A protein has these predicted regions:
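Extreme N-terminal leader/anchor segments
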Residues: 1-47, 82-84, 92-98
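Aromatic-lined, polymer-binding surfaces characteristic
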Residues: 33, 40, 80-286, 290-293
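Catalytic Cys-His active-site segments of thiol-dependent hydrolases/isopeptidases
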Residues: 423-428
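An N-terminal structural lobe/cap that precedes and organizes the functional/catalytic core
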Residues: 66-73
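Extended, charge-enriched "interface" segments that sit outside catalytic cores
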Residues: 44-66, 84
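Carbohydrate-active enzyme catalytic cores, enriched for enzymes
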Residues: 258-422, 477
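CBM-like, beta-strand-rich accessory domains located in the C-terminal region of large
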Residues: 127-129, 333-345, 431-607
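Histidine-centered active-site/metal-ligand motif
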Residues: 200-202, 253, 405-412, 451
Length: 607
């Protein structure tokens, strides 16, 4: 859409400004009147409990000692815990003030708005370049993910509560949004790095700024160039997805980035009276909306390649709106709902869970088929089947080792049986300076050492786009799935001429066989087949390793004991929340030094 058409669309609906996001007010009245909706009832109860908890606690200060820790030792969690609790408090009080009659929530909301306006910067220390004196001096006006989100939250609150908040609160909040975010964005003579990014940053930052601008700027002639710039960033965001709609950052970042794309798109649609509808005109966006159908493996378990959690709830507001817009969309089980306000206090998501959730529609769309699928550009394979009443899910990937939020994981896979993740992807680790710096691939969950892939001559996979796989064969049949990858280019190993990995899933018996075929120009010094699990393994009879779950379920890993020696070691993994986990590394080392070797291993449940 060109500038003239955008301006005409904005001007034609300029009088709609007062009714923006009116659906949240309507929904609040419905809930107070006794609307029967189990998802919204749970949402309301959770919000009320959180709001009451915050009412009993003072607003915690953001001390310099916490702010400087990232610069000193790379730690983020101390500052971010306080920072995000403030955003959770903001969201809880705003939603509680909409839903409840308790008069205490408005003064509490005013206090947290005032405290946020007092903050030195809305940007996280991890996103500030503290080595750049010019940027450090302008930290209050630096725009990152969370400065943008804060600007949107405050502008939306001012819009919804302008007649209930003290005028001084509204005036100050609007002033800070303009000073810290809108003016730097509108007046900057060079682009922010995230404006041309093809990851979640472009959508979250631009989408938040776009929504803040829609609320704050009524004059269409001033608003239009801001939204033009936002739309350019949104176009870059869509480029980061494969043509089939896959998000290589993982499902968590799909929720984050695409969520903000949808939030902005829907508000822009309202502001233009339906004349600009990104979800209608962007066909790729519709394919992106279907990505969770591929990613959810069973119940709340997901294919969690890259920096992604192993399980995920659904966001009922976002899914409701997408189901309204896309007829063929299916959703996973409603039994697993995301927290009403997440650990970062994402206001936009919590508000739209309130405003958009359509329980009846979600129930109609609930349930994913037991089928196998392949994403050609992403090189992801997913299989789902049922054997003897048990659900089996398998996911494997090719790709390359410079993907967004990359892990060195070419040829890696996940294996789940009836809710037990036997062969695991560790997912995202604890975010620190080191995690996104030169030490990234020394961290277990990012290195191929922490994935179920071979170790050749003591070498792990290398990072970089040149380290990649090639798909040789994909076979999807009623009783068997096959996925054959050429992994030769994933390793910087001299004399490795060929390495092919075949995944062969027998969907009649629930057996997965992995076969690695090697060809060297000189004899290898070592070949180790590594498997990653969180369940204690023990060597059973010859050629068997048994994994045991606490509920009594067991899995058998079978191999040729004449060809492979088994060894088991443990390692520690810090998950995304900083919790320590014991990881079991099951290594099957070849006793042979022949140049050509074929090694097969089979996984099967013990019924």
């Amino acid at each position: 859409m060109n500038s003239r058409l955008l301006l005409e669309a904005l001007q034609a609906a300029e009088t709609h400004h007062a009714s923006l996001f009116e659906e949240v007010r309507t929904r609040s009245v419905d809930i107070r009147s006794g609307m029967d909706n189990p998802l919204l009832t749970a949402h309301r109860i959770e919000i009320r409990q959180l709001a009451d908890q915050f009412l009993a606690q003072p607003i915690e200060a953001l001390p310099f000692s916490a702010f400087r820790l990232f610069q000193v030792n790379g730690s983020r969690k101390e500052f971010e815990k306080i920072y995000f609790d403030r955003r959770r408090r903001l969201a809880a009080f705003a939603i509680a003030a909409l839903l409840e009659e308790d008069a205490a929530f408005i003064p509490a909301l005013e206090d947290i708005i005032w405290a946020i306006c007092d903050e030195y910067t809305w940007c996280l220390p991890a996103h500030l370049n503290v080595q750049d004196s010019e940027e450090e001096d302008d930290a209050p006006r630096h725009v990152d993910l969370f400065a943008s989100e804060t600007a949107h939250a405050l502008s939306e609150i001012c819009h919804l509560f302008k007649d209930r908040l003290d005028p001084q609160i509204v005036k100050r909040a609007r002033h800070e949004v303009i000073r810290r975010v809108l003016n730097p964005y509108m007046q900057l003579k060079r682009v922010f790095g995230w404006e041309t990014a093809t990851n979640n940053w472009s959508a979250v930052c631009a989408g938040s700024i776009g929504m803040a601008a829609i609320y704050m700027i009524q004059d269409s002639r001033i608003l239009m160039p801001v939204l033009n710039r936002v739309l350019e960033a949104m176009a870059c965001f869509l480029e980061g997805f494969t043509e089939e709609g896959a998000c290589l950052e993982g499902l968590g970042y799909w929720y984050y980035g695409f969520g903000y794309y949808v939030y902005f798109a829907e508000l822009l649609k309202q502001r233009t009276g339906g004349r600009v509808d990104l979800l209608l005109v962007e066909k790729k966006a519709q394919r992106i909306a279907e990505f969770p159908q591929f990613c959810f493996l069973q119940e709340n378990h997901v294919a969690n390649f890259s920096d992604c959690g192993r399980t995920s709830g659904i966001q009922p507001g976002l899914f409701s709106r997408l189901c309204q817009r896309i007829e063929q969309l299916r959703i996973p089980s409603l039994s697993h709902r995301s927290n009403s306000i997440d650990h970062c206090g994402r206001f936009a998501t919590a508000m739209r869970d309130l405003a958009w959730t359509d329980y009846a529609l979600l129930k109609k769309r609930e349930g994913l088929p037991l089928r196998s699928e392949f994403l050609q550009e992403a090189e992801w394979m997913v299989s789902r089947c049922q054997v003897n009443g048990k659900l089996f899910s398998f996911a494997a990937k090719g790709g390359h080792n410079a993907e967004p939020h990359n892990h060195n994981d070419i040829g890696h896979f996940v294996w789940i049986v009836d809710g037990v993740r036997w062969l695991e992807d560790l997912g995202a680790g604890l975010y620190t300076r080191q995690y996104f710096g030169d030490e990234r691939y020394s961290i277990l969950c990012n290195s191929s050492a922490g994935h179920s892939v071979p170790i050749i001559n003591g070498c792990f996979q290398s990072e970089g786009e040149q380290y990649r796989s090639q798909v040789v064969e994909v076979g999807i049949q009623d009783g068997r799935d096959r996925f054959l990858l050429d992994l030769r280019q994933a390793y910087d190993v001299p004399h490795l001429h060929k390495l092919e990995r075949l995944f062969d899933l027998d969907k009649q018996q629930g057996k997965l066989t992995i076969t690695d075929s090697y060809d060297f120009t000189e004899s290898p010094t070592s070949i180790t087949e590594r498997f990653i699990t969180l369940y204690p393994p023990e060597v059973g009879k010859e050629g068997e390793i048994i994994l045991s779950a606490s509920d009594g379920q067991k899995l058998r890993l079978m191999y040729d004991a004449r060809q492979l020696n088994a060894a088991i070691q443990t390692a520690e993994h810090l998950d995304h929340s900083g919790n320590a986990e014991t990881v079991y590394l099951v290594d099957l080392k070849s006793v042979d030094t022949a140049r050509q070797q074929v090694i097969s291993m089979t996984l099967e449940p013990m019924f």
